[in-house]
Amino acid sequence: MANHKSAEKRARQTIKRTERNRFYRTRLKNITKAVREAVEAKDVNTANEALKLANKSIHSFVSKGFLKKQTAARRVSRLAQLVNTLKAA
């Protein structure tokens, strides 16, 4: 248990940040999973919609400081490549 006022505040902040990061991490996994499942099902329309949502969400995570800019770009790029393989086939 914290003995100083500043340590107590830090403990509270850590709990809040952990919860927030868990929410973002789960959301990121679910969004990515939706795109991958749509591609596996060979559903072009659903894959495009999921990719659009993923792109929007991932870039919003950058503005909130959860992801770095290059990490977000890489993730979106890989998902787009995956969807484009569906269009080519």
UniProtKB/Swiss-Prot annotation:
Annotated region (Disordered) at 1-20
Task: Give the family from UniProt.
Answer: Belongs to the bacterial ribosomal protein bS20 family.
Function (record text): Binds directly to 16S ribosomal RNA.
What name appears for this protein in its UniProt entry? Small ribosomal subunit protein bS20
Annotated GO molecular function terms are:
small ribosomal subunit rRNA binding; structural constituent of ribosome
| Keyword Ribosomal protein appears in the UniProt entry | yes
Q: Cellular component terms, GO, for this chain's entry? A: cytosol; small ribosomal subunit
The record lists the organism as: Campylobacter curvus (strain 525.92)
Q: Which gene encodes it?
A: rpsT
Q: Does the keyword Glycosyltransferase apply?
A: no
Q: Which UniProt keywords apply?
A: Ribonucleoprotein, Ribosomal protein, RNA-binding, rRNA-binding
Q: What is the lineage of its organism?
A: Bacteria, Pseudomonadati, Campylobacterota, Epsilonproteobacteria, Campylobacterales
Alphabetical GO biological process terms: translation
Q: Which SUPFAM superfamilies match?
A: Ribosomal protein S20
